[in-house]
Amino acid sequence: TFDIVFIDGLHLEDQVDRDIQNSLKFLNKNGTVVLHDCLPISEWHQRQVYGGGGIWAGTVWRSVAKLRMTDSSLEINVVDIDWGCGILRKKTKNTLFKKSIIDYSFYEENKNELMNVITAEQFKELYK
């Protein structure tokens, strides 16, 4: 089992979903999963196909958003640094984000609440 798992692989929702589920299977009780590229800054940066050249966050954000809407057994925060670093920990009875639509315009309008965005300073306090 692992204390920490870092996911920064193929930046597509389906693969990220699998990476998260596989990581959680082998995560220690108090372990943490960290995901990179959770906060794309534009619709172009979250496109499905990389195509080379420049930064690509892909659709990682969709995997995090789905978990925020459906899995109350996970504590989820996204630290607003380096394209968004998602922090997932096994907990109980967490509040779910109560929506089911997740397209980019919805993400853009609701990013902070949907992704449970925190600052680097808040991260330092929460995860001492």
Where do the model's predicted regions map?
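A short alpha-helical cap/connector motif
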Residues: T1-F6, L10-K128
